[in-house]
Design a protein with these regions (language model features):
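Metal-dependent polysaccharide deacetylase catalytic core of the NodB/CE4 family, i.e.
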Residues: 52-137, 198-200
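A structural signal for the main folded, soluble domain(s) of proteins
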Residues: 25-27, 34, 38, 67-75, ...
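Active-site-adjacent pocket scaffolds in enzyme catalytic domains
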Residues: 133-221
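Active-site beta->alpha N-cap acidic-glycine motif
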Residues: 1-71
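A solvent-exposed, charged loop/short amphipathic helix patch at secondary-structure junctions
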Residues: 19-20, 92-101, 212-221
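Hydrophobic faces of well-ordered beta-strands that scaffold small-molecule active sites
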Residues: 4-8, 46-48, 75-79, 129-131, ...
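Short acidic/His/Gly/Ser-rich catalytic and metal-binding motifs that mark active-site loops
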Residues: 12-17, 84-90, 204
Length: 221
């Protein structure tokens, strides 16, 4: 039997344009029910991979709790390092982008995971088992910390895609290269890695960065 898993990165409005000190709104919460209803109509159970500002939105918490109670969705965790407390200043490169969590010292990575995990417990009463890294970036330390905090499934690998052109914040820090990772489910440091399905296409339907354009591929969530 083959399984069809739908995962949704669930985060604040226009998060990629956010600058430190600006408010991150979550108006998109009011539209999530439409997609949930569509999934439920066809018997699909989506995984809402949710980041810091979303799990602090009372309407979102109510939406998730209602649908989890009906067994129509699953809650997952999604961590964007730049707006997930505690805040820690990294050096900034000349052509830098948003920071990857794996750029931070281990103790800061752990502190950020502690913050969002404890908030999950506070808001929902439990820690979800599924996770996706912000900006897809994983390394050995990240896998080890996820296991330590009770997460058991990751879906950050994008087989066939390199993010080396997607810079982090610190000087010359490039994203991960997943061109050679397996498309099959595998165990990594106790975590079950379920790679994202990647479909080759002739055109892009996203506002792509350079690495997406060079690969000419679309990631299906």
């Amino acid at each position: 039997m083959k399984y069809f898993i739908i995962t949704i990165d669930t985060e604040g409005d226009n998060l990629w344009r956010w600058k430190p000190g600006q408010e991150i709104t979550t108006k998109n919460v009011r539209y999530l029910a439409r997609f949930q209803e569509l999934c439920s109509r066809y018997g699909f159970k989506p995984v809402w991979l949710s980041n810091w500002e979303m799990i602090n939105d009372s309407s979102f918490v109510e939406f998730i709790n209602k649908n989890v109670e009906m067994d129509s969705c699953e809650l997952g965790m999604h961590l964007h390092a730049w707006n997930n407390p505690p805040f820690y200043e990294l050096p900034r490169g000349e052509h830098s982008g948003a920071p990857y969590l794996i750029e931070y010292p281990r103790e800061i990575m752990e502190a950020k995971l502690t913050a969002i995990t404890e908030k999950m417990k506070e808001q929902f009463g439990y820690v979800p088992v599924t996770h996706r890294a912000g900006r897809w970036a994983m390394n050995q330390t990240y896998f080890e910390l996820l296991y330590q905090y009770g997460y058991r499934i990751d879906c950050s690998y994008t087989p066939g895609i390199s993010w080396r052109d997607s810079m982090g914040q610190t000087p010359d820090y490039a994203g991960p290269d997943y061109r050679d990772v397996s498309k099959k489910v595998q165990k990594i440091h106790g975590i079950t890695e379920v790679p994202v399905t990647v479909e080759r296409t002739h055109r892009m339907f996203l506002d792509c960065n350079k690495s997406w354009k060079s690969n000419v591929k679309t990631v299906l969530f």
